[in-house]
Structure formats: structure tokens, C-alpha cells
Amino acid sequence: EVAVNKLLEIIDNAEGKVILVGHSKNGIIVSQAAEYRSQKIEKLIYLAAYLIPNGKTQAEYSSQDTEGVLKPYVNRFPETNSHTLQPIIYKEGLYHDCDDDITDMAKCILSHESVATGITPLQLTEANYGSVPRYYIECSDDRAVTAFIQQKMYTETSCKKVYKMATSHSPFFSKPK
């Protein structure tokens, strides 16, 4: 909820409509924000992101993604209700088609994520969230959120258009153009 509220604050302070891009777990955040500010959002773009329907959780979908390589490398921190990935999996799991300097940078910038966003059911309505056009960019070589689960999500929750890129989970680093 903290992340959603921060995004809502940014949307509220923006002039005109915004385009939200959600990557990975942040698909959840942009979806919930669209429920609360649909009139301020031109479109939603999901980049290898969790596109979860009303009443469901990210955990329900990630548990079906049996080909993903990240799960054994998740460290949990109950005292802060957060988790993070072990750096040893960064290259193989997130950046396998990127230069090594990208993996080195990731070791400095990736941080803990709230567990709550993955286990809290989304509260979405057709009138609000459903009124915002959705687009999906599938990363077909993704080892974190595999093509299987990406396809399942954008098939269950329709998008105006689906684009496919033969990239890892991080095309903004491997194929920025």
C-alpha cells in the first residue's frame, strides 16, 4: 500500500494524463493505482510484469511459474516483512543477455521488496481499472517471470495489444532501443 500511495501522489501532482509502465512485481502497483486514478491514466504498459485480475495475488501466479529460476534464491526478512534476491542469481535470473557491468550495477541498486504486495489480493473494478487501456510486452527469454506465466496473465486479463521481445527480464538494459 505504501508503494501504491506514493504512485498516487505522483499521479495527482502530474499535469494531464500519465502513462504508467509496470515492470515485474510493479505490475501490481500500476494496476491498483489505475483503480484509484483511472481518469488520470492514459494507458498501462506491463513489461514482463504481473498482470493480476481482481481478487487474486502475485503469489498465486508465481507459484504456477515452475520454470522460473529465482525462487531458491529469495532471502526472507520476517522482521521487516520483506524479501530480496541473492546476488548470485542476478546474472542468470535477471540479466543473462546483459553485459557484466549491468549485473555489477544491480548489486548496488536492487533492494528489499515488501512481501505484502505479493500476498495482498488486488481490488479492481471494471468501471475504473477496466476502463484504462492495457498493453503487454512479453520478454520471451525471461527466466524470472517466464513466458509461460506472462502468456497466462495477458490471456486471462485482456490487453489491447501484446508485443514480444526475445530478451531477459531486463530489456531496458539488454535492448534499450
Region locations from a protein language model:
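Flexible "cap/lid" loop of the alpha/beta hydrolase fold
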Residues: E35, K40-I41, I45-E79, H83, ...
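Active-site loop/oxyanion-hole signature of alpha/beta-hydrolase fold enzymes
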Residues: E1-I19, E35-Y36, A59-S63
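Conserved serine/cysteine hydrolase catalytic core
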Residues: H112-P176
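Alpha-helical elements of Rossmann-like donor-binding domains used by nucleotide-donor carbohydrate transfer enzymes
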Residues: V2, K6-I10, Q32, I89, ...
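Conserved alpha/beta-hydrolase catalytic His-Asp/Glu region
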Residues: T80-N128
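Gly/Ala-rich beta-loop-alpha elbow adjacent to hydrolase catalytic centers
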Residues: V21-N26, V30
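Short coil/turn segments at beta-strand junctions that form active-site/ligand-binding loops
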Residues: G16-K17, E42, V132-P133
